[in-house]
Amino acid sequence: RTVLEGLMLAYRYILEKVGRGRHGLVKMKTGDWNDQAVYGRVPATKIKYAQKHGESMLNSAMAAYSFRIFGEMLLAAGQAEAGAVSLAAADEMKAAVQAQWNGKWFKRAFLGEKLGWLGDDLLWLEPQPWAIIGGAADENMKKILAANIKALLCDINPNGAALISRNAEKQENSAGLNTGELENGGVWPAINGYLVWALAKID
């Protein structure tokens, strides 16, 4: 296969096999980058439910960026119709991500009606950089988001931005992990790298 054919397979897999949920976001399936988002926080009896109905803000924000780049590549390759479809999908994904702004940050994931949203009352870092990079955050959102990331994620750890905020009233419970450890609020270089990229886009 050519590189373009391989990219098209991946693109179509996301749209046609993984699909989108009721909020227009990429479905969570077995999880996204953070396995603990499902396996660490969903009761064992409801994991199958969350996998079926869940939606990933992280994957959706990345798709908003990736589909736009892919669409531009298709146009440059002379595939006008396919390029237009990819660009339209990017715009739809961007709008779906933007709709989950809660006034302070973007939510993390939808786990189905029975379980609700993850990341509404606590700030999860993972989707935030990609919401900026993918264009879902407008200028006002960017400034609010940057301030909250600094105050709630950067200032609590000298080694970088933590994955999850915490306060006296609420902390996330992740099976088998202490607060501030690994996916349960630890510092991950990969996500901090995307954060640097995103923050560089803010005036």
Regions from the language model: what does each represent?
Residues R1-K27, M57-S60, A64, L182-I202:
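Aromatic-rich carbohydrate-recognition surfaces in CAZymes
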Residues R1, H23-G54, G103-P127, A161-W188:
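Carbohydrate-binding/catalytic loop surfaces
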Residues T2, Q51, L58, A77-A88, ...:
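A structural signal for alpha-helical segments
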Residues W130, A136-E139, G193-L195, K201-D203:
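Short, glycine-/Ser/Thr-/acidic-enriched flexible segments
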Residues M62-E172:
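Catalytic cores of carbohydrate-active enzymes
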Residues K52-S56, I69-F70, A77, I202:
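A generic structural motif
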